[in-house]
Amino acid sequence: NIIFQSPSAVINFDQINLIEDKRIIAMGPGTSNQLRKHSYVAEIPDKEYSSEGIINLLNKSEITGKTLVIKGEGGLSIISEYLNSASFKTDELNAYTRQKFESYGDIKKQFSDSDFVIFSSALSVEIYFKHIHNDQETLKFLAVSERIVDVIKSYKRESKVIDYFSNDLVNEIKLTLT
């Protein structure tokens, strides 16, 4: 079993051509699409594109053999911790390192004309509120999961979950913001 937690995990996994005979699981549609570029069809959770969604998917079938969870350094270890606690042989591989910028000045300018911000990770929320957000801004915040909503709430801001992988993202944004 090989579980990819993000598109970046796929991009940075240097042995991608050696996993043909493995059960491949992707965290969500974006990760699955990245695997398709290498001609792999991955299983993905039905709805909840999260660690919990992966765990639910795994629990629907028999887990056999070893499992490798490929992720970014500093990413969540919920899947590995769950599998290890259930006595399944599980390893993690950090295929990339998340890095913050030295300066956010240029990026901050890009938000000056924005009406909303979509957050796809807890790290993006942290960076935004620590380095980019201006308290005078009246932006609306959207999150790709309830977990990200909770992180946004920790900054005392409200947000809504959006189906980021919708076939019509523009319409999804309009529906969510109304």
Regions found by a protein language model. Give the residues of each.
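Conserved beta-alpha
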Residues: 1-178
